[in-house]
Amino acid sequence: MKLSEISDNPGARKKRMRIGRGIGSGKGKTGGRGGKGQTARSGVRIKGFEGGQMPLHRRLPKRGFNNIFRLEFSEINLDRLQDAIDAKTIDASAVINAESLVAAGVLRRSRDGVRLLGRGELKSKLTIEVHGATKSAIEAVEKAGGSVKILAPKEDKGEAA
C-alpha cells in the first residue's frame, strides 16, 4: 500500500444535495420549501406561533424575579485552602485575602468577594480576610489557632455614580 493509494471506504462521504437546480434533480422548483407564503421565505417565521392556539410561553404562569442588587461571592472550602497551602501556592504566614487567592490560582476571579465555607479541616494557623464565612468555617479556623476577619461588602452594583 502506498500513501497515494489511501482512500475512504466507498459510501463514507456523501455528496450534499444541490437544491433548486431543476425538476429533474428531485429538489427543483420550490427547493423543498413547500408552497408559497411566510414559511417559503428566508429568515421569516413567527417563533413560538402555534397556529392561533395560545402559545406555550403564554400559557405558563410567570414566576420569580432577578434581584439586581444581589452580590455573587466566589466560594472556597477549607479543604481547598489546605490543599493550596500543602502545595505551597499560598503562604500560610501571610494574610489570605481575595487578591492572594486569585494570584495563587486557587480562585479564577473574586467576583463580589470571597465566602469561606466549612468543608474539610485546617491544619495551619491562618489569618483570613473574606467578605463572608459560615459559622463552621470560622470555628475551624479559630480551632487551628487562626483568625477570620469579615470585610464589609463591596459597593452595590446597581447604584448610579
Curated annotation (Swiss-Prot):
Transmembrane segments: none
InterPro entries: Ribosomal_uL15 (IPR030878), Ribosomal_uL15/eL18 (IPR021131), Ribosomal_uL15/eL18_sf (IPR036227), Ribosomal_uL15_bac-type (IPR005749), Ribosomal_uL15_CS (IPR001196)
One Pfam family it belongs to: Ribosomal_L27A
Record keywords: Ribonucleoprotein, Ribosomal protein, RNA-binding, rRNA-binding
Biological processes per GO annotation: translation
UniProt-listed PROSITE patterns: RIBOSOMAL_L15
Single GO term (MF): rRNA binding
GO-annotated cellular components: cytosolic large ribosomal subunit
Residue span of region Disordered: 1-43
Amino acid composition bias (Gly residues), ranges on this chain: 21-37
Family per record: Belongs to the universal ribosomal protein uL15 family.
Subunit structure: Part of the 50S ribosomal subunit.
Main function: Binds to the 23S rRNA.
Protein name: Large ribosomal subunit protein uL15
Organism, as annotated: Rhodopseudomonas palustris (strain BisB5)
